[in-house]
């Protein structure tokens, strides 16, 4: 400190005076700050009190606000309920208003109805009084009628008693006359038995003739099939030659005739037929006919039959059932080839045609008929052969007409014509048929029905009995089968007398009329009465259960 230019005493004095001032200033500042701190503490305490008071007020205000909000929500919900209630009340008011209007209207209607009912009630009362008066009058008249009719019944009872007494006496007289006639009946039965034995002998001879003629017909069918096959071959050769000469033949036919024909198919079909058809084997009847099942149908001819019909009552009783049977078996009058190809549209025969049917008067056919190398002398019908195809079954029907109208129908006075020409069509089932007439009228709901016949076929009673009592024997193929090479034929030809092949016409039927005389008439009279009862028994005695017919 000695080295300094100032003296230390002076510095010490100056520093002491300055520090005092600083201390004083500091004390003053401390006092000032203390006063300010005290004032601030007081103001802070006051503000703290005010803050607490304000916080309490704020809390009370928040509680009031929450209460106000809750109250507002409650009031809003109440207001909404009141509004909905008001709407419901308005709807109810509208409904009640409409109901009130409807009730007012219904009340008016009920008043009007009440007035009407009152007037009706008055009218009904008056009507009741009137009906009561009329009812009393009716009761009185009814009592009078009752007394009158009671008296009439008493009179009728007395008359009926008298009638019974008279009839009793008459029946007693008839009984005595019947007892007296018993001896005559026994004598007649003995004579009828003898006649039946004679008829059975005639039937045996006739059946033998039938078998012979069936063999002849089988041979004729074979010859006819071979002839048909040769004709098909010739036609096929002609068509092939025409196609070679005119390649556009099919187009020309279509242009000129307006018909579309497939010649290629026809040629192929014809070749198949010629390849598959053969007539070298013989016809054999395998099974015997069912005589009992075919008896009723053979005694009843429904489609142009050539058999006379003298027992109309028995035949007409089964007409409905036989017609339905005929519809079910529409193929029985034709030869059915099961394995033949289908028929073509040009009616070219593809297999064996049906054999011509045998006339039922076979016993009266002359021996010139049995020659196989000559065709029948009766002219054929102009109706073309019919070809139908059902499930590859080929069916051909030959129809022969027997137009010998001028034969000896009246050569013998002991014979009567039993079936005459009748070309009308019957449109209905009639209970009666006429036998002895010539009529070409169409019947529409008439009470009588003529027996349809083949064209102009007239027979006598002798031929009629020969046919009707042996129809089952003529149909030898009724339930059997006829076997040929290349085809199988179901021989259900139960309607051989239906007019499709009656080649043995009236000429042969009536030429035999003079040969029988009175015996024929007696035989026909006997058979007309007992035909339907004895046919099955007689025919069953003439055939064995199984036999074969070999050509």
From Swiss-Prot:
Membrane-protein topology: Peripheral membrane protein
Localization: Endoplasmic reticulum membrane
Low complexity bias (residue ranges): 7-21, 309-321, 372-389, 401-413, 456-479, 490-499, 507-517, 525-540
Top-level division of the source organism's lineage: Eukaryota
Listed Polar residues bias regions: 541-551
InterPro entries for this protein: She3 (IPR031398)
Coiled-coil positions: 20-110
Region (Disordered): 1-22, 285-551
Pfam hit, one: SHE3
Summary of the function given for this chain in its UniProt record: RNA-binding protein that binds specific mRNAs including the ASH1 mRNA, coding for a repressor of the HO endonuclease. Part of the mRNA localization machinery that restricts accumulation of certain proteins to the bud and in the daughter cell. Required for the delivery of cortical endoplasmic reticulum into the emerging bud.
Protein name: SWI5-dependent HO expression protein 3
Gene name as annotated: SHE3
